[in-house]
Amino acid sequence: MSDLSKYRNIGIFAHVDAGKTTTTERILKLTGQIHKTGEVHDGESTTDFMEQEAERGITIQSAAVSCFWKDHRFNVIDTPGHVDFTVEVYRSLKVLDGGIGVFCGSGGVEPQSETNWRYANDSEVARIIFVNKLDRIGADFLNVVDQIKNVLGAVPLVMTLPIGREDDFVGVVDILSRQAYVWDDTGLPENYEITDIPADMVDDVEAYREELIETALEQDDDLLEAYMEGEMPTDEQVKMCIRRGTRDCSFFPTYCGSAFKNKGMQLILDAVVDYLPSPTEVDPQPLTDPETGEPTGEVATVSVDAPLKALAFKIMDDRFGALTFIRIYAGKLNKGDTILNSATGKTERIGRMVEMQADQRNELSSAQAGDIIAVVGMKNVKTGHTLCDVKHECTLEAMIFPTPVISIAVTPKDKGGSEKMGIAIGKMVAEDPSFLVHTDEETGETILKGMGELHLDIKVDILKRTYGVDLIVGAPQVAYRETITKPVEDSYTHKKQSGGSGQFGKIDYIMKPGEVGSGFKFTSSVVGGNVPKEFWPAIEKGFKGMMDTGVLAGFPVLDVEIELLDGGFHAVDSSAVAFEIAAKGAFRQSMPKAGAQLLEPIMAVDVFTPEDHVGDVIGDLNRRRGMIKDQMAGVTGSRIKADVPLSEMFGYIGHLRTMTSGRGQFSMEFAHYAPCPVNVAATVIEEVKALNAKK
């Protein structure tokens, strides 16, 4: 039985190209899990094992690896940095207890680092900070520390200082122990010596040490009071306070180094052991009502002796077969056990269990609370499903994923590809909850929906190369929505007579705008028996069913409230079907009267540009109907934040690179829906009508 206090379930988060995957490679090298470190730029990293990852030099999936350091077990997840794959970051945060935020020593706090940091804050995940790439030209550790304070609003607790800058970066000073770690030029992580602090750094180290101790001791009033009276705490007492403050996110221990040059990595591994929480030191996962999704007040207390409670957080189909990644919160899981999937009510028998080393597998006979493992061949499990003891059914808090904002139509080039594509897409949808698919019934086209251009580009590439489906790909389409802007009181009668019993249903109602994000809401204030209560659910069903297809251009409808006021029925001809049809007709009749309006998705765009191109970038965003929200000057350039309609952002990366001579970067994520300008709405509606006319 493993000691849970020696478990560390951690994620590595950062902006694209800040060095997350290289950091993971160095961790695996130092912990003895790999003997030759693979490099991202060579396409050989252990955690980037998809073809598309190796080629593009980015992480697309979150890959789980296990390793050991100083008798502690690390389960490490290397997550994507590109905003189109943020869902991977989100679901990783759901099952982690701590994290390492990696920042580039020259790039500082970049757009996606800010997004990931916000997600980690929302999940209350304890973190340490690693400022990487200090061997690069322009790297400035203390400048990045200032950005972390000013941009993220975080409190970085500086634990190490760099010795030398850029090409002359040779090592780090451990501030608490007052020791210098200096590496030689071989690039080997073990080739270092511990020496005295360089003479020209002594004063700085003492100043930072005093600040470190004062900040840490704020976690313990007695130690702080003694310190103020002149009594120095021991290093162990300071570490205890740092651990406490890190666990509750009061501050974030901050380290510097170069993962690529193997400098400073041992101190980061020590920090994971010393300061990040074990599974028993984080708030337990809440249990929810399976019907309503509301918390029950009970929690999944982390204990090996409790009944099984586990969460399936990722499905992956690789060359070995279907894998279900699960985090075990309570209990034990043995090969051959029969467990319950509380989402489906069906049981599953555990066949093979494996511990992952990226795309390598180690067979397991058992696992316990605190473990992150993969189970081979589960049939009916999806991301977010709870797996539990058959005699102790429970449901863990659900995983909520963002709604796709962009779509493309794809068709196989030959008829034989249809079945192959269907099988492939089924697997891909199971793997990625932010990737949705449906078939256009009129055209027969398959519509792929995703989080951005790169997201869908990768999916098409996987279909073509991994599954061998040759495709015709249409232009990207925006996920518009419709809504109403004013209340309308109306009446509708459905009457049909065709011999024998007919159909009759009359409803009087108010259709009015709902609160933003409220979706559909139905209430009834009918008094008396003019519309018997037994027909109310059918009326609600009819209205709600029409929310999928608006009257302007057939887009889904947002935020509508219906209040049923009165109506009429016929003793023979009225039925649930008649009233459902009446509600559908009422929706079509009243939505135009209620000021139907087209909505477009607005993206929160974060652009980095060299200073001499700021004017061009802002002017271009304005031409794209963007609203500038913020502009921040940095050492290497400026960051511009703007809200821009998605329809104006297709192909933006190429245009930005042209404007900035290849030096500009940007990220964007869905912000909200907003009314389309009249001229834009008219164009969109005409385009939809023209497209429908061709069908």
From Swiss-Prot:
It comes from the Bacteria. GO terms for molecular function: GTP binding; GTPase activity; guanosine tetraphosphate binding; translation elongation factor activity. Catalyzes the GTP-dependent ribosomal translocation step during translation elongation. During this step, the ribosome changes from the pre-translocational (PRE) to the post-translocational (POST) state as the newly formed A-site-bound peptidyl-tRNA and P-site-bound deacylated tRNA move to the P and E sites, respectively. Catalyzes the coordinated movement of the two tRNA molecules, the mRNA and conformational changes in the ribosome. Its main location: cytoplasm. The keyword Protein biosynthesis applies. This is Elongation factor G 2. GTP binds at residues 14-21, 78-82, 132-135. GO terms for cellular component: cytoplasm. Pfam families: EFG_C, EFG_III, EFG_IV, GTP_EFTU, GTP_EFTU_D2. Keywords: Cytoplasm, Elongation factor, GTP-binding, Nucleotide-binding, Protein biosynthesis. GO terms for biological process: ribosome disassembly. Belongs to the TRAFAC class translation factor GTPase superfamily. Classic translation factor GTPase family. EF-G/EF-2 subfamily. It is found in: Cytoplasm. Residues 5-280 form the tr-type G domain.
